[in-house]
Amino acid sequence: MAAKLRKFLLRYYPPGIILQYERDGVMKQKPIDLLDLTPDVDVEVLLSQIIRQEPLISENRRPALRQLIHRLIDKMLEQQHHSFTLFKVLRAHILPLTNCAFNKSGDRFITGSYDRTCKVWNTFTGEEVFTLEGHKNVVYAIAFNNPYGDKIVTGSFDKTCKLWDAYTGQLYYTLKGHQTEIVCLSFNPQSTIIATGSMDNTAKLWDVETGQERATLAGHRAEIVSLGFNTGGDLIVTGSFDHDSRLWDVRTGQCVHVLSGHRGEVSSTQFNYAGTLVVSGSIDCTSRLWDVRSGRCLSVKQGHTDEVLDVAFDAAGTKMVSASADGSARLYHTLTGVCQHTLVGHEGEISKVAFNPQGTRLITASSDKTCRLWDCDTGECLQVLEGHTDEIFSCAFNYEGDFIITGSKDNTCRIWKALTASSQPAGPGGAGGGLARPTTAFSYND
């Protein structure tokens, strides 16, 4: 039976259109990624290209498709020039924080702490929703199962990982198997697998539905401190103190490539959205760009004078940034490899960096007790977020880019709100990893 297109769904970050179609009575989704979309694109040429390449879309869908493309362009053109003001100071924990993370919609976030708990917060009121208790040591690594946001996973120095209901706080499973501390973790975008990385030199894959271990990823010769899935969820990258990163096949648990070349411990790794590239940062003062298919190093980014502590791609994968203990961040154009800007101004090391969903702004968190907001086009520092009394080690934007959270060793978490943002969840959104809301949806019954 031929597939029938039933609905278009819009995804803003990164730009794309999700095709919802029916085949043999089963509803499925297929993304059309528009990662290179710009406001000056020739829309009619783009429409013809999509219709020519995608069998599900016939010529009579052109008007609906045109409207969606214009919606994406309008979203890009929205002014992102607002500054941020302090909204709430949360005396979050009695002991220092370890990490903080938003859910996809941005209405809730979580904080982990040395006090052995994880707390869930309402972003728009600053109130604690509930506390996740049960770990016997530091809660270090935490995450929502975005884009769904209905589960939370916590990784602890007690060697276990716990899976929780994000709405009720109910404990689903305690995942046991690591021999030492768990320091990094992630859900796959499909929310079916959890990956955990440990100081025992291994990573493990766990089944979300059953809580059972699916595989142990063994091969690193030192601690695993970074990991992440690609968008398709079929590959995982791990970064280790053994100077290497590794690519693994999630289905088999086998190592696909060893990414060797750094001359010091790997501190951070990440896939681009398309899943074609991996960036790694190292204490050897460099970051490296790797080809996923071949495992080959495409380029070595030099220029920092001290350890690279964090690396990141923007949502579309067109920009890449490295943050360093030298107090600077370096912003690159991914395709050309050119360093567009060196972001200088912090008086201490930068341990965390994050793009806003639009890829127009960047925040850096520093030991100088401040966060800085940067313009990605000009490299200009737009704002210094001041008020913390100790090192800031965590920072994040929500999905709409109008709220920022910062976590500090002063035991507080601060919520910063864009001056144009309402205190309610921001308007329509879509979601970036395969789940999209029908903000503009066209349905077909033929």
UniProtKB/Swiss-Prot annotation:
Show the InterPro entries listed in the entry: G-protein_beta_WD-40_rep, WD40/YVTN_repeat-like_dom_sf, WD40_repeat_CS, WD40_repeat_dom_sf, WD40_rpt
Q: Which cysteines are joined by disulfide bonds?
A: none
Q: Which UniProt keywords apply?
A: Cell projection, Cilium, Cytoplasm, Cytoskeleton, Flagellum, Repeat, WD repeat
Principal place of residence: cytoplasm
Q: Where are the WD repeats?
A: 92-131, 134-174, 177-216, 219-260, 262-300, 303-342, 345-386, 388-426
Q: Where is this protein localized, as stated in its record?
A: Cytoplasm, Cytoskeleton, Flagellum basal body; Cytoplasm, Cytoskeleton, Flagellum axoneme
One matching Pfam family: WD40
The GO annotation for biological process reads: intraciliary transport; outer dynein arm assembly
Using the UniProt annotation, give all residue ranges assigned to the region (Disordered).
Answer: 423-446
Please name the SUPFAM superfamilies in this protein's record: WD40 repeat-like (SSF50978)
Q: Quick one: a GO cellular component term?
A: ciliary basal body
Subunit-structure text: Interacts with IFT46 and FLA10.
Query: What the protein does?
Result: Functions as a cargo-specific adapter between intraflagellar transport (IFT) particles and outer row dynein. Required for efficient dynein-mediated transport into the flagellar compartment.
UniProt cross-references to PANTHER family, sorted A to Z = PHOSPHOLIPASE A-2-ACTIVATING PROTEIN
Protein name listed in UniProt: Dynein assembly factor with WD repeat domains 1
Q: Which gene encodes it?
A: DAW1
